[in-house]
Amino acid sequence: MNIIKRALTFEDVLLRPCYSEVLPKQVKIHTKLTKNITLNMPLISAAMDTVTEHRAAIMMARLGGLGVIHKNMDITSQVREVKRVKKSESGVIIDPIFVGPKASVAEALEIMAEYRISGVPVIDSDRKLIGILTNRDLRFENDYSNLVENVMTKAPLITAPKGCTLDDAEKIFSKNKVEKLPIVDEQGRLEGLITIKDLKKRKEYPDANKDSFGRLRVAAAIGVGQMDRVDALVEAGVDAVVLDSAHGHSKGIIDTVKSVKEKYPNLDLIAGNIATAAAAKALCEAGADAVKVGIGPGSICTTRIVSGVGVPQISAIDECAMEAKKYGVPVIADGGIKYSGDIAKALAAGASSIMIGSLLAGTDESPGELFTYQGRQYKSYRGMGSIGAMQKGSSDRYFQQGTVQDKLVPEGIEGRVPYVGSIKNVVHQLLGGLRSSMGYVGAKDIEDFQARAEFVEITSAGLKESHVHDVTITHEAPNYKVNQ
């Protein structure tokens, strides 16, 4: 029997405290998602159909992280989710949604509802701005067959010239008491749009993760050989794609990485999941811009039990990160996170960012079903290897595409997690724990954290001592749950 080495996970280790001159509030938590994309905080919401669609992705990006839209939907639906994130907020909207004057009120309302916007510019066939239609114009309009040109606020409108900065726009908003500011060229053609909502969001979420156009960043999951999905996502403006598989160290994944990077060399591509240095080396050499680590650590994943395969997560992160570092490729730790301390341990072990599923599945923004059980609220949460998820489309992730439904071999379960409110509150607690850890170690940023970190291996008695013991909890803390 060939036993290579002893492997450890989060509960097997603790970080040693060090001399510190750094307070938790002073630490910097920006990091790399990929070789080319920076995050303002190191958390990513998982590409799972009970965790991340546009609502979760929007909030994660506003908080400085990122959401990965799952692929358990057709291409058109996934593209729509990406567009909802990209159009949810902008500095200057360079491709604003618009309508023509002959469109009906019903058509305009449908567009506004789809993109969750409160108004649209109205342009003629030459793209000249001839009016704007807002909720104010529609408030008392009952005839939905009426034409937009009969209801809209007609030109002349308050506008701004090309090159208008957000600071200039704020002055115009303040002076004219308007909510939308169209950007026009010298001929009066629509070139962009700035909204008061986006300026408010800019102040409310100063650490938002945005692209060069001021739009929120978003990633989306793809499968092996799904070039048509990649094409559509690139057209929609996706910032990164995540090649999602249970076994990233396989020919199909490596070939897909090469194909995508050959066609779209400037598209950031994250590949996984892996758990060994050899896998990290193969994906980095194939062209991956980040690698995702985790074979079976997730709370709803049964891969290690069903297949007998996997590597405990701390050891997997350490091994993959040391290899990926040779190529300048960041590592994403995916799975097994139960507490904020696990995030700190994963980063200290070499990960650049952390993908989270179960801790976000119970939030307002997750797409899972909200229900009540024994007087307490829960949301549904399932693994992408569960029977339900595989039947809906994720079977290719486990190399079972084309398998009839009653012959599927699941590698995950379906369950429930407690309802926890907004993502904003959950992330606040998780980042608070990370900042505290960095303060204990004396690290000013994540790179310094990794350089300073020293681990000790603990016994089962040490783990028991680490948790609450010899007392009955009467009031639960927001960052420590008894049933975890």
Task: Map each language-model feature to its residues.
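Active-site-adjacent beta->alpha loops and helix N-cap segments on the catalytic face
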Residues: K25, D74-K83, E141-S145, T165, ...
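Catalytic cores of alpha/beta
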Residues: R55-I58, D228-A236, A275-V293, A333, ...
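Glycine-rich phosphate-binding active-site loops on the catalytic face of alpha/beta enzymes
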Residues: R62-S77, V238-S250, D289-S307, I337-L370
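Short beta->alpha transition motifs characteristic of CBS
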Residues: I69-D74, I117, P121, K128-Y144, ...
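Catalytic beta/alpha-barrel core
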Residues: I69-N72, F98-V99, G119-P121, T159-P161, ...
